[in-house]
Amino acid sequence: MSRYRGPRVRIIRRLGVLPGLTNKTPQLKSSSPNQSAAKKISQYRIRLEEKQKLRFHYGITERQLLNYVRIARKAKGSTGQVLLQLLEMRLDNIVFRLGMAPTIPGARQLVNHRHVLVNDCIVDIPSYRCKPEDSITVKNRQKSQAIITKNIDFSQKAKVPNHLTFDSTQKKGLVNQILDRESIGLKINELLVVEYYSRQA
């Protein structure tokens, strides 16, 4: 299954707020109490929707998400928490969480177009896995600097999570540590995602 490129509002209307996909908030349709009571949601659908939240928020394909689940299963610790850490430490997500891009698709475009440096080296792979003490900077070109400055001004209200620091004057970010569960920028039940893939991973 390829990466989603359709209307983003339709997705958040179904799954709720997904800050990585879009900064818009969904306008939910009002339903009568009788309609809500009559609509029983299956356990499969609940797990499926949690999985879809992860996939659309981080902008990854079904195959990529399944691979991350398989890696998380082999690692020490809680599979769900390791899965979230793997996704959060992707370069495109780090660029987004630092406020250098308004969304993860926007961050992925910056990385693909070679605007972003990791430890002073250009990295154009959005899935690149960042690690503690990595520094994230912008290419010293007028176009690159202008894009990031505009994005920072747009995203300045967003709080940088505890595992990252960002110097807006130097346009430099730093990965301090692997993030903890509380720093995840998404309302998600990762255990349901692991359960969804229990027969596939």
UniProtKB/Swiss-Prot annotation:
Subcellular location per the Swiss-Prot or TrEMBL entry: Plastid, Chloroplast
GO cellular component, as recorded: chloroplast; small ribosomal subunit
Domain S4 RNA-binding, chain residue ranges per copy: 89-150
Keywords: Chloroplast, Plastid, Ribonucleoprotein, Ribosomal protein, RNA-binding, rRNA-binding
GO-annotated molecular function: rRNA binding; structural constituent of ribosome
Domain of life of the source: Eukaryota
Pfam families linked to this entry: Ribosomal_S4 (PF00163), S4 (PF01479)
Single GO biological process annotation from the record: ribosomal small subunit biogenesis
Matches recorded under InterPro entries: Ribosomal_uS4, Ribosomal_uS4_bac-type, Ribosomal_uS4_CS, Ribosomal_uS4_N, S4_RNA-bd, S4_RNA-bd_sf
Function according to Swiss-Prot or TrEMBL: One of the primary rRNA binding proteins, it binds directly to 16S rRNA where it nucleates assembly of the body of the 30S subunit.
Assembly with partners or alone: Part of the 30S ribosomal subunit. Contacts protein S5. The interaction surface between S4 and S5 is involved in control of translational fidelity.
Family: Belongs to the universal ribosomal protein uS4 family.
Protein's name in the database: Small ribosomal subunit protein uS4c
Lineage of producing organism: Eukaryota, Viridiplantae, Streptophyta, Embryophyta, Bryophyta
